Curated annotation (Swiss-Prot):
Its main location: membrane. Residues 254-294 are annotated as: Disordered. Gene3D superfamilies: Death Domain, Fas, Tumor Necrosis Factor Receptor, subunit A, domain 2. Residues 28-183 are extracellular. Pfam families: Death_EDAR (PF24979). It comes from Oryzias latipes (Japanese rice fish). The keyword Heme does not apply. Residues 267-279 have a biased composition (Polar residues). It is a single-pass type I membrane protein. GO terms for molecular function: signaling receptor activity. This is Tumor necrosis factor receptor superfamily member EDAR.
Amino acid sequence: MKMWKRRGQKKSMFLSSLLVCCMFASAEYSSCGEYEFFNQTSNSCQACPQCRPGQEPNMSCGHGMKDEGFACVPCPQGKYSKGKYEICRRHKDCNALYKATVREPGTAEKDAECGPCLPGYYMLENRARNLYAMVCHSCQNAPLNTKECKKTTEAIIKPPINPGSTTVLPHPGSPGQGHLATALIIAMSTIFIMAIAIVLIIMFYILKAKPNGQACCSGQVVKAVEAQTNKLEDKKDVPDNVVIFPEKEEYDKLKASPQKTVKSENDASSENEQLLSRSIDSDEEPTSDKLRSSEATNHNLCQANVGYKPDLCLLSLGLLDHRVVCNGTPASAGSQANNTQAPNHITSSNVSSMNAINNNNKTPGMLQSRRKKILDLYARTCHVTEGLSPTELPFDCLEKASRMLSSSYSSDAAVVKTWRHLAESFGLKRDEIGGMSDGLQLFERVSTAGYSIPDLLARLVQIERLDAVESLCADVLGSNEIVALVGRQSVNSFHSQLVCPSPCTSPSPRCASV
């Protein structure tokens, strides 16, 4: 028995000593920094070897561990690195992505630098002219007075002619091309004639199968004329002292569809202004004089019954700036006090006036100032996040941007681009885009390819998604600076019943810490 007790004591002592050694070893490894490894010879943490510019580490080193065979290897062709512990990144593709010329080609130690736009492309003047804002657009959508596009059209219209020669020789063409053009014209003419003949035959059989069509139509006309004459006779029979309320005629007028807004045919920025009008309020609060005038001219709006319209949050945000109030009471109280008309009749007669107020509030000047502020935020964010990849942002920031890019809706000018259009702007193939489910996978893919946060913002500007640019800039710069620059206005309790709440009113502390 004593022998067994001694053996048990020896085993327990051995296990306890082994646990103590493991605890000391783990404590020593955990005390090392991000780019340090634990040297068992010197029993201390040492810094990992740094690579020179144009090189990258082939193994991992840091947090107390160092892989065997750690060394610095040169960057492959088409990539660059600034040295130390940075991996090699791909050079900027000025021609394919930015549609610009190459000012300085990229080397193994620095990135490529883009120059002016390619022939047939131009750059908007109201955008920041920095390294990451060199986004050129096609001259097909350019205004008439664009200088870069004028040069291209003049070069096409006025080809160079030798002043010494007085005759212009035609271009020699092969006889085979002439015969091919003739055959193509004959084939197209034959197809066109056959199509016309088929249409005429079908129309002939349709008219032959329905011989009583004209009689039916003439009978309908006769019935309509008789109905009008009967109405006139009924009106004549009514005495003069009887008052007739034309409720049906007024109701028919109210049921008429509102006029469609005229689309702007300006440059590519007009489409973005129409998109921004869905998500912004007016930047300036109306004065008391404007409030009095709006109460006098739009007093019918105070009769809108909010209780009968739970989906009034889909109305334009222009109602927030007008603050429709009658004698200190909200619109719902006005509708309850007035019992002369039905609620459905009141609301149907006021929807068109609400849309008219919304269209008057969102003037082009407000949209331009809003666009300028967002582009200023974009330029500042590019300066702050230079060299950072998108995956270095917190997960909740990337998830919010992915949700914004996943929602697709149509505006008056164009269809809002989604993350799939963003992937196409990065040059990804459709097969690869089809394998992705959301924007988070796209952010991880472009980060692996070596693109940075400014590159991502530049693509968002290129596809006209300034709302996503504003969201990412707000997450990076923080809420205080965004409030000072953009100046959003607060909403009182009554108007909060009319507007759907925003999914993310302010960036989280994790986003603002970037």
